[in-house]
From Swiss-Prot:
Pfam families per the UniProt record, alphabetical: TsaD
PANTHER family assigned: TRNA N6-ADENOSINE THREONYLCARBAMOYLTRANSFERASE, TRNA N6-ADENOSINE THREONYLCARBAMOYLTRANSFERASE, MITOCHONDRIAL
Binding-site residues, substrate: 134-138, 167, 180, 272
CDD domains: ASKHA_NBD_TsaD-like
Protein name: tRNA N6-adenosine threonylcarbamoyltransferase
EC code: 2.3.1.234
Residue numbers binding Fe cation: 111, 115, 300
Organism: Escherichia coli O139:H28 (strain E24377A / ETEC)
Primary localization class, coarse: cytoplasm
GO cellular component: cytoplasm
Role: Required for the formation of a threonylcarbamoyl group on adenosine at position 37 (t(6)A37) in tRNAs that read codons beginning with adenine. Is involved in the transfer of the threonylcarbamoyl moiety of threonylcarbamoyl-AMP (TC-AMP) to the N6 group of A37, together with TsaE and TsaB. TsaD likely plays a direct catalytic role in this reaction.
Length: 337
């Protein structure tokens, strides 16, 4: 069975084709980073217009890459939420229209379920059950996963997501958008211990996160210590260490609470090398395993949507003729497969 996946939830247009026997047959991606860089963040209207321009050509490119035609596609999956409503509507409209024209099922996919299942695309996929750390620009969540659609929210950010805090702090340090990866690169040149940032909400029970205060702490540290290159690098190092330590502490608690031996990292921030190294070290000490997708599948992409669509299609999920999206869509509302 072959599923075409369409991802347009934010500022990446991702198209992929997944075969349940052969794996990933095609993967096309267009990033709008340069388009939004001058504005310091994603402009929803510009994102939607660019998806309109790029989605169909990328579908054609994916078919060409795979050597397939429309007749070879068994279902069309598209991101139905959460995300920017205009951007979501582009992918949903194209996906639903193609499914109708090709006379195949249309499968609405939850964007965060796509991220959560992205490590399943690797050669050594995780088995259930596991604790999932979904960490991106829009979400920071700890989830108990016992099967497809069997998701229990253990904790989440009560304000800024970790990725959002990275980008905002990077902007304070004078870095371009998107600043998260640039901040991490700068942090690698920083001196550990010169500045010590707090580890928010680790001094109390629970699995929720709060990262907005770290941005304020960074702003005050910059104000009080100047902006020479080494100071900026030291501040970046202190900030990244604080975020990584906070995530690690909460992951430990979640693993203790569930008793699970497997940890899955997903979302854009899961590509962070420091976070990967620290969590890998932690799981080795616990005699457990950590899983994550390759870096290009940590950020938004069509491959994860094609795979999640295939899983949902096998479980009997389909869409009606209407085109509907959900900009806000709790993961816990998904049915079990």
């Amino acid at each position: 069975m072959r599923v075409l996946g369409i991802e347009t939830s934010c500022d990446e247009t991702g198209i992929a084709i997944y075969d349940d026997e052969k794996g990933l047959l095609a993967n096309q991606l267009y990033s709008q980073v340069k388009l939004h860089a001058d504005y310091g963040g994603v402009v929803p209207e510009l994102a939607s217009r660019d998806h309109v321009r790029k989605t169909v050509p990328l579908i054609q490119a994916a078919l060409k890459e795979s050597g397939l035609t429309a007749k070879d596609i068994d279902a069309v999956a598209y991101t139905a939420g959460p995300g920017l409503v205009g951007a979501l509507l582009v992918g949903a409209t194209v996906g639903r229209s193609l499914a109708f024209a090709w006379n195949v099922p249309a499968i609405p996919v939850h964007h965060m379920e796509g991220h959560l299942l992205a490590p399943m695309l690797e050669d050594n996929p995780p088995e259930f059950p596991f604790v999932a750390l979904l960490v991106s620009g829009g979400h920071t969540q700890l989830i108990s996963v016992t099967g497809i659609g069997q998701y229990e929210l253990l904790g989440e950010s009560i304000d800024d997501a970790a990725g959002e805090a990275f980008d905002k702090t990077a902007k304070l340090l004078g870095l371009d958008y998107p600043g998260g990866p640039l901040l991490s690169k700068m942090a690698a040149q920083g001196t550990a211990g010169r500045f010590v940032f707090p580890r928010p909400m680790t001094d109390r029970p629970g699995l929720d996160f709060s990262f907005s205060g770290l941005k304020t702490f960074a702003a005050n540290t910059i104000r009080d210590n100047g902006t020479d290159d080494q100071t900026r690098a030291d501040i970046a190092r202190a900030f990244e260490d604080a975020v990584v330590d906070t995530l690690m502490i909460k992951c430990k608690r979640a693993l203790d609470q569930t008793g699970f031996k497997r940890l899955v990292m997903a979302g854009g921030v899961s590509a962070n090398r420091t976070l990967r190294a620290k969590l890998a070290e932690m799981m080795k000490k616990r005699r457990g395993e950590v899983f994550y997708a390759r870096p290009e599948f940590c950020t938004d992409n069509g491959a994860m949507i094609a795979y999640a669509g295939m899983v949902r299609f096998k479980a009997g999920a389909t869409a009606d003729l209407g085109v509907s999206v959900r900009p806000r869509w709790p993961l816990a509302e998904l049915p079990a497969a």
